[in-house]
Regions:
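Core nucleic-acid recognition elements
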Residues: 1-201
Length: 201
């Protein structure tokens, strides 16, 4: 069973939300955004309900700083969530899983996290897209579903064959840039030139 909890900084400590609200208003010029709230969402599997509840105030949150919720507050706000791409290391999830394991003295649970943004104000579709584009770094993250999954176990298709590249070490600067674009690589020209020199020997 998957257990879910939302954690939000108390208003007087919500510096991240206040800073992002300021950025959106000043940099994106979206004055119609009146308020912004940020929640850290934790989905946990392979633990008991008793252990999950025990960890609410010790692992997931700090009672003096945070508010916790079993469900998102009901509002008329626009809500979206952001999670790491599959394969990206999630430091928050890993630390959480390790802490739960220490508390339970048992097996390490499966933990997935996401950041949930709650936007208040009348936002046009184009404004919402601009905010999402500002918040979501496509190299490492993506928009997440708001629904709770049945399981956190994910089956990935393992490729039966891997493409072999030929002529990589002979590419010139323009061809290297085209190579980066073609494969959507998370590196700049200097990075790939270093790789080319390395393999060229």
């Amino acid at each position: 069973m998957v257990y879910r909890i939302y954690v939000e900084k108390k208003k007087q400590f919500a510096d991240e939300a206040a800073s992002l609200l300021s950025d959106i208003r000043s940099l994106l010029m979206i004055d119609s955004l009146e308020e912004l709230r940020i929640f850290n969402r934790y989905d946990v599997e392979n633990i008991s309900e008793e252990l999950f509840e025990c960890c609410e105030k010790t692992v997931f949150s700090e009672p003096q700083l945070d508010n916790t919720y079993a469900r998102l507050p009901q509002t008329d706000a626009t809500v979206f969530a952001v999670e790491y791409l599959p394969g990206q290391f999630d430091q928050r999830a890993d630390s959480c899983a390790q802490c739960i394991q220490i508390v339970s003295e048992g097996d390490k649970p499966t933990v997935r996290t996401a950041k949930v943004y709650m936007l208040f104000g009348k936002l046009a579709p184009a404004q919402l897209e601009a905010i999402k584009k500002y918040v979501i770094n496509p190299v490492e993250s993506r928009e997440a579903s708001l629904e709770k999954p049945e399981t956190l176990n994910v089956n990935y298709n393992i490729p039966t064959s891997v493409e072999t590249l030929t002529g990589f070490t002979e590419l010139n600067e323009n061809e290297l840039q085209a190579f980066i674009d073609k494969y959507a690589l998370a590196m700049d020209l200097a990075d790939i030139e270093f790789c080319r020199k390395y393999f060229k020997g």
